[in-house]
């Protein structure tokens, strides 16, 4: 087993199983223009799903949809800013009118942010942006898409989360982890209601992925992680097996340790905070 497999959630390369699970089904993927969302869209289209691509970047979405369709897939692009309440409501209405109750929703759109507290004194918008994209945005969309799914008594929601909401929060990640944690708690809270109506909810707690969001942080380049195409296999596993959660094996003991040994955990975080620095982009963005 390679190191990247050991520190990330289990993934599957069972193409036949994925095809059986999604062929002829309609799957919506947010954040589909880059990174994991794009990789998931490609994987699902190749497996026979009708893929609805959602992101803010219209040109990227349209190009991806055209490529998938030219390769024999079936894809539709829906450019939208989910932080806009009106746009999110209109998107949900349009998708429901055109496609009916969805079979799978992959909540992947997100905004990462790593910045020290002293650089955020005059950047309250950092928190507004992360909350808007990572918490309120997906709720806005789901509130519009869930009614027909619950009425149909079927469907699956897959939330792409982070191990950071399951273990002791790391320094400089406050805005990001708080927003991801907020959605995680909300989704776990409504899951019993959704399951009562026949829906399945799966959360994939991802460790490090090599994407545009992680690229600016130097230490992320040397830690073991997954490329988007590899991480897409975790989503494929979630669709095929429909578990409640997917997480690296070490998340549970790390969570227990942080609770049972708060002193050593806090000491480690202080060492980590001193050993790491803000990126140039974060530092420049924090100076006003």
What residue spans do the PLM features occupy?
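C-terminal helical subdomain
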Residues: 203, 220-259
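Conserved mid-core segment of classical short-chain dehydrogenase/reductases
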Residues: 112-128, 172
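Residue(s) in the substrate-gating loop at a strand-loop-helix junction
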Residues: 162
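Active-site helix of classical SDR
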Residues: 142, 179
């Amino acid at each position: 087993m390679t190191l990247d497999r050991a520190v990330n959630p289990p993934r599957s390369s069972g193409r036949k199983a994925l095809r059986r699970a999604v062929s002829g089904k309609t799957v919506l993927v947010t954040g589909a223009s880059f990174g994991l969302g794009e990789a998931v869209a490609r994987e699902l289209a190749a497996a026979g799903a009708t893929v609805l691509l959602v992101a803010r970047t219209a040109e990227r979405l349209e190009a991806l949809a055209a490529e998938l369709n030219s390769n024999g897939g079936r894809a539709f692009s829906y450019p939208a800013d989910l932080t806009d309440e009106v746009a999110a409501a209109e998107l949900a209405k349009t998708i429901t009118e055109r496609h009916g109750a969805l079979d799978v929703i992959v909540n992947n759109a997100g905004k990462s942010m790593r910045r020290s507290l002293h650089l955020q004194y005059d950047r309250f918008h950092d928190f507004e942006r992360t909350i808007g994209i990572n918490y309120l945005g997906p709720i806005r969309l789901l509130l519009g898409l869930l009614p027909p799914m619950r009425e149909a008594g079927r469907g699956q929601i897959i939330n792409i989360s982070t191990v950071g909401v399951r273990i002791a929060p790391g320094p400089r990640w406050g805005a990001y982890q708080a927003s991801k944690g907020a959605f995680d708690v909300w989704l776990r809270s409504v899951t019993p209601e959704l399951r009562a109506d026949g829906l399945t909810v799966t959360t994939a707690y991802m460790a490090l992925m090599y994407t545009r969001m992680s690229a600016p942080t130097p230490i992320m380049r040397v830690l073991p992680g997954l490329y988007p195409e590899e991480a897409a296999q975790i989503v494929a596993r979630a669709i095929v097996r429909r578990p409640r959660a997917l997480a690296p094996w070490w998340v549970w003991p790390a969570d227990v340790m942080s609770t049972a040994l708060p002193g050593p955990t806090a000491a480690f975080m202080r060492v980590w905070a001193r050993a790491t620095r803000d990126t140039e982009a974060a530092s420049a963005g924090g100076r006003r």
